[in-house]
Amino acid sequence: MDIRKAYLDFFASKGHEITPSSPLVPDDATLLFANAGMVPFKSIFTGEIPRPNPPRKTSCQTCIRAGGKHNDLDNVGYTARHHTFFEMLGNFSFGDYFKEQAIAYAWEFVTEVLKLPKDRLYVTVHENDDEAFNLWQKHIQKERIYKFGDKDNFWQMGDTGPCGPCSEIFYDQGEEHFNSSEDYMGGDGDRFLEIWNLVFMQYERSADGVLSPLPKPSIDTGMGLERVTAIKEGKFSNFDSSLFMPIINEISKLCNKTYIYESGASFRVIADHIRSSVFLLAQGVSFDKEGRGYVLRRILRRALRHGYLLGFKQAFMYKLVDIVCDLMGGHYTYLNEKKDFIKEQIRLEEERFLSTIENGIEIFNEELKNTKEIFSGEVAFKLYDTYGFPLDLTADMLREKNLKVDEEKFELLMNEQKARAKASWKGSGDKTASGDFKNLLEKFGENHFVGYEKAECESKILALLDEDFKEVSTLKDAGWVMLENTPFYATSGGQSADSGFIAKREVLDTQKFFNLNLSFVKAGEELKVGDIVHARIDTEKREQIARHHSATHLLHHALREILGSHVSQAGSLVESNKLRFDFTHHKALNKEELESIEKRVNEMIINSSEAILENMPLEEAKKSGAIALFNEKYQGNVRVLTLGESKELCGGTHVKNTAQIGSFYIVKESGVSAGVRRIEAVVSKAALEFVKNQLEELSKVKDELKNNDILNGVKKLKNEILSLKNELKNSSKTELDSKNIQGVEICVKRIDNGDIKAMIDDFKNKFAKAVILLIQVKDEKITLAAGVKDAPLKAGALVKEAAQILGGNGGGRDDFATAGGKDLSKINEALKQSLETIEKAL
């Protein structure tokens, strides 16, 4: 049974509009990831945006709980129902139906669609919610309805705002399968399993804690797909269901080990974590050192450590991407489009970590011998800083030994590192708007953007705010103006804001707060609320912004055409004199690729394609082939821009014909983070300025070379430099002192100049048997290298021992190895220890 489809179809038949899952990265600064079904509708529940039409929605929302307030990462694999990635089925009413219909719908779906036995179902309500208690008695015996307090049956979004009692449906998995003393309704056992939560949002909680009835109460429900699938299939663990077992079977095949539930935590961790990794990468999150990208890295590295326990010593996670796409690509079709890109990203990240995991585990095990209860915070930090072990990975390894890590010491060292990194940084931070925009929204509604059609207009001033966002009736100083109709485009979707004039006041910026367009003006003549003023934009700036914005669409199309369909927008900045476009791709672009992209964009410009703008429902737009961005929030009808072969959802300002863009030049290509590249480019007047500057630079080079043939002049210079380098290399060879032990020539020394590898090679060539270790310091950076020739030592082990004394690490072949170090104060100690090691071996 396709429960996901059955659920959505059921509520569609009850007048609910099916809403596609919103991005895992929400348009909400308070959330790391979408972690519940109601996240896309939060602004509706809080009144920030008007109620939709129809006021009933249903969805299957993809969710991540790994990091932030809601973090299930540590429990995944060890319990039957915790996941980092899951799907939440939900139905929502925004001031439409309330408790009676919500309860009736839930009961009908559970008993008639899912066909769960009624004698296995129980219900809970809030102890003071007599209305829900009485309504439930129409469907289920009174004895099966339990009352609980705020802890279990009251839901609120935050300390203030919409809230209300909730009612939960439980499923009895059978007394015969469970024997815990907690296996009763309200207990912590696993026998009675909550499958659906119905939230009755009927109150508004004020800052002083007072509950006031909402004029139009709402419904928010959530049912975990993984949990209800396991119940429907008669499984006691989500991991035993058809959503996970194909992945677990594939892991079993790859490692040639049989999966047994009781000892299969590592299988379950990997099966869960590959799902979250695939979805996060598909939606534009990339591996990084901070933020969401670091959560993704933590998830994958935790899975790799469990893979190590199963015997995987080489990259393997990327081989599981196919089975995830097979299982879920039918509903989430974008997975198939990004499959190859996802596999490559995971493989590269695996190889990054696998190169250090063995050394890290070795250090972990050594410290474990000295640990009784608390694992050293210093060693945990070293594992993080040097070997890439996230703290929760170390904690997970310790959990298996019933030990804990000294998190306080770890955080102290982490903060010290951050302080050092920021020692030279000074700044005041962002000023936070403190105005009550919600009141303005309730008073006036959204003001109207007329800038698509008009560059100037007469408009009424609805509100004025000072620089601290406090409402004022008159304004002479700098501040914010809210016009009834505004031609000024607010910063949005990467496009920078318009500038211009309101009356005689210069507009420097326009921003959107709670869907209100507010323009920031310089100090000047007095403005009053209610004034009718003339507003006009800087049309020259608008046109240049439009040219650069349209060019980003052509660039996006060219990237997908030349590099592959895995490319998606990961960020953009559009200004009047440049554009910046971030996109998903696993490696730097070569010269040929950049030339092809630049050429393709210019071809599309020359084709003189008319811009076609259409408004249509989101689903219709997607079916037409329009590209939607994962990090954008779309509601109701969307605006679709077609420029030749490019077709995207976009709310920005654009040219009427691609020919207006002029010419397109790529200025720079660079990396932003793992799996994300950036192209900076210019068009129109900025492109002409760029070419002019390039020609001027070439002219200066020609003058410096005193040669009209620039290319040959540069080649001649390069040959001269190479010749001088060789002379310097030969002149800098240092005569190395050595001594002979048992017929083996030994040299252990610090050097300041010369090519360290060349010196080791020269030393080994002079003698039949040789052992040499050199430490070189340049710009406070320590480099170690060792060489062995026909002697009972290994260069890799020798250099590793010395590097660890210096706070670094390294290795290599038995005959030659290199390493790096950090602690300059311990160089003599490292040299002494290395000499002792060599002498003992001989």
From Swiss-Prot:
> Keywords assigned by UniProt?
Aminoacyl-tRNA synthetase, ATP-binding, Cytoplasm, Ligase, Metal-binding, Nucleotide-binding, Protein biosynthesis, RNA-binding, tRNA-binding, Zinc
Q: Does the keyword Protein transport apply?
A: no
Question: Which transformation does this protein catalyse, written as a reaction?
Answer: tRNA(Ala) + L-alanine + ATP = L-alanyl-tRNA(Ala) + AMP + diphosphate
Extract the GO molecular function terms from the UniProt entry: alanine-tRNA ligase activity; aminoacyl-tRNA deacylase activity; ATP binding; tRNA binding; zinc ion binding
Q: How is the cofactor bound?
A: Binds 1 zinc ion per subunit.
Supply the EC number(s). Answer: 6.1.1.7
Span of the secretion signal? Answer: none
Tell me if tRNA-binding is a UniProt keyword of this record: yes
Q: Name one GO cellular component term.
A: cytosol
Which InterPro entries does the record cross-reference, listed alphabetically? aa-tRNA-synth_II/BPL/LPL, Ala-tRNA-lgiase_IIc, Ala-tRNA-ligase_IIc_anticod-bd, Ala-tRNA-synth_IIc_core, Ala-tRNA-synth_IIc_N, Ala-tRNA_ligase, Ala_tRNA_ligase_euk/bac, DHHA1_dom
Domain of life from the UniProt record? Bacteria
The Swiss-Prot or TrEMBL record describes its family as follows: Belongs to the class-II aminoacyl-tRNA synthetase family.
Q: What does this protein do?
A: Catalyzes the attachment of alanine to tRNA(Ala) in a two-step reaction: alanine is first activated by ATP to form Ala-AMP and then transferred to the acceptor end of tRNA(Ala). Also edits incorrectly charged Ser-tRNA(Ala) and Gly-tRNA(Ala) via its editing domain.
Name of protein? Alanine--tRNA ligase
Q: Give the species.
A: Campylobacter jejuni subsp. jejuni serotype O:23/36 (strain 81-176)
**Highest lineage ranks of the organism?**
Bacteria, Pseudomonadati, Campylobacterota, Epsilonproteobacteria, Campylobacterales
Designated gene of the protein: alaS
